[in-house]
Amino acid sequence: MSHTLPALHNAMWPGLVGKGDDPGQEPPISLERMLDLTAAAEVAGQKFEGIDYFLFLPHTNPEASDDELKAIADLIVSKGFTVGSLVAPVWPGTVGDSAMGDEAARKKFLDAVKMACRVAEVFNAHGARKYGVIRIDSAEFGVAK
């Protein structure tokens, strides 16, 4: 199967969502391990061409320096991938808060979107990301629900 579009991307957030250090939880899967698993995956000769990336710990500190973000971009590219969509850390319990909340919550929500835009700008300028969106949702219920 040969194609140029759409590019096939793997989402990195399953390595984080529902994971943790509490009793009964599976530990988060490291970014490098997720990239290695993605690089090894193949069905009928088709492999992943890129990743879609959740901008939160432990994979990424959303407040990381440009140099730290470039190092992450280099790791992703070294595995043969480009970065596509970025998932802004908008939920309560990450950086953001509900878009439907009070003024303080809405400010946190917008700050999280701005952080994602900054990361996108660094990845774009560094050459690791040439297309994609910044994914957001209302974050109405947060990560606890």
Feature-to-residue mapping (PLM):
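N-terminal pre-domain/capping segments
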Residues: 1-133, 143
